[in-house]
Curated annotation (Swiss-Prot):
Family according to the record: Belongs to the DEFL family.
Keyword hit for Signal: yes
UniProt GO BP: defense response to fungus; killing of cells of another organism
Predominant location category: secreted
Protein name, per record: Putative defensin-like protein 264
Signal peptide: 1-26
Disulfide bonds: 47-65, 53-70, 57-72
Organism annotation: Arabidopsis thaliana
Record key words, sorted: Antimicrobial, Disulfide bond, Fungicide, Plant defense, Secreted, Signal
Entry GO CC: extracellular region
Localization (cell): Secreted
Amino acid sequence: MEKMVLRKVVLLAILLSLSCLWVAKALEGESKVSGQVRDETPHTWYCKYDDNCRENCPGCTITKCNYGVCICSNCYHQQSDLGVESHM
């Protein structure tokens, strides 16, 4: 009986340690994503159609040619693109 309880405790400890490792790995992934800077200011270029805006706004999730002007927003840039030094 004691061996069965001991096995269950060991199994529970292993599962708990694996879940902690999984959480730590997930948090590490979030820290890599936070290395990107989100640009909230819209950028504008002249355009004739939406494809021009996609070419001029790399990394932007919203691109639209509106009355001949590209509207680019929700843009993500690597910190190195913005002139910020990275010490990784």
